[in-house]
Amino acid sequence: MDMLHPSSVSTTSEPENASSAWPPDATLGNVSAGPSPAGLAVSGVLIPLVYLVVCVVGLLGNSLVIYVVLRHTASPSVTNVYILNLALADELFMLGLPFLAAQNALSYWPFGSLMCRLVMAVDGINQFTSIFCLTVMSVDRYLAVVHPTRSARWRTAPVARTVSAAVWVASAVVVLPVVVFSGVPRGMSTCHMQWPEPAAAWRAGFIIYTAALGFFGPLLVICLCYLLIVVKVRSAGRRVWAPSCQRRRRSERRVTRMVVAVVALFVLCWMPFYVLNIVNVVCPLPEEPAFFGLYFLVVALPYANSCANPILYGFLSYRFKQGFRRVLLRPSRRVRSQEPTVGPPEKTEEEDEEEEDGEESREGGKGKEMNGRVSQITQPGTSGQERPPSRVASKEQQLLPQEASTGEKSSTMRISYL
């Protein structure tokens, strides 16, 4: 048994015919020497159904993210550029699920060796692109929080597009072994990777290779970035910042929280997969039907991660939430008429609250100033009683809207004889 994937149940007990290592579109070979009819029924009906549901949800969610970023963002930010590439990788990652569901339902690969190689290569490229994008996003968060001034000229949308293109190229280079060794070997009916002799050494080396470059290496960089961010935030926690700096820092913290949530979900969904495969290299896992559900869950989690990212964006980002509403509720005239009061999707809810608080504080300051002027006017022995300034009266009318219906003269008299 090699790199886990319950895409088909091998009926052979020969180790040489076991499916090969590729996450996650390799087959789970040798689950048992003779699978039960009940196990075949579950594999042929329930598993394809789960894959198709995940595929539909993932395609719809990531398509919505791509549309919102491209249509409802006038000038995409650096983070939005990376989110766009992450959503594109997740969407292409979902395209391999129908082939996987067909192999589960039919118990063999019906699409030929060329499609096997193409599907596995595209699947691998998008898998590595996802983790590489998360790594780049974490580095971007580090630069934005720890070195905001020095990194300003590098943290631009054109630079982010160049970095994203480099990420796709790097992913294509990393999966070259998949292009070379994947296919449908003679005498077998499943799509997997066929290694030269010694096959066990090649298989173990490839598992370590993919785990190091596709998970543990990037995870180390991500953890280092957020460790430095925490140190920076704690060291600057007691400083007094100007209002503009405070607003920018709050915005950076919101974006950082969203990126951390996406990274945490990725680790949660992919960690069991890689850990179980590394354990399988050291000590072969049990090949019993009782463990089939566990193996399926471990392999299904990475696909579920790709369809869960849009949900995270909707919950954690106000701009994406507003963009989703504009797209999904577009036919409603009522919602459309209320859109201008909500504001553009690039504006966060917290920023609206900050502006409202700022306006209230400014109005409060004006009110205090007005009260001081009114008290000076009403003091006995001053000449201000006979000629109160019109500017004071107009401001008092704004502060006292219930008196707006009276004339200007009466308002002035009320101010004079308070």
From Swiss-Prot:
Biased composition (Acidic residues): 348-360
Phosphoserine PTM positions: S332, S337
Entry comment describing in which tissues the protein is expressed: Brain, pituitary and pancreas.
Bias-annotated ranges (Basic and acidic residues): 361-371
Cytoplasmic side: 70-79, 139-161, 232-257, 317-418
Glycosylation (residues): N17, N30
GO cellular component, one term: ciliary membrane
Gene Ontology MF annotations: G protein-coupled receptor activity; neuropeptide binding; signaling receptor binding; somatostatin receptor activity
Subcellular location: Cell membrane
Post-translation changes: Phosphorylated. Phosphorylation increases upon somatostatin binding.
Residue ranges that the UniProt entry lists as topological domain Extracellular: 1-43, 102-116, 182-205, 280-293
InterPro entries for the chain: GPCR_Rhodpsn (IPR000276), GPCR_Rhodpsn_7TM (IPR017452), Somatstn_rcpt (IPR000586), Somatstn_rcpt_3 (IPR001856)
Region named Disordered: 1-21, 335-418
TM stretches of this protein: 44-69, 80-101, 117-138, 162-181, 206-231, 258-279, 294-316
SUPFAM superfamilies tied to this protein: Family A G protein-coupled receptor-like
Polar residues composition-biased segments: 7-20, 373-385, 395-418
Example GO BP: cell-cell signaling
Pfam families in the cross-refs: 7tm_1
Chief location of this protein within or outside the cell: membrane
Protein name: Somatostatin receptor type 3
Source organism of this protein record: Homo sapiens
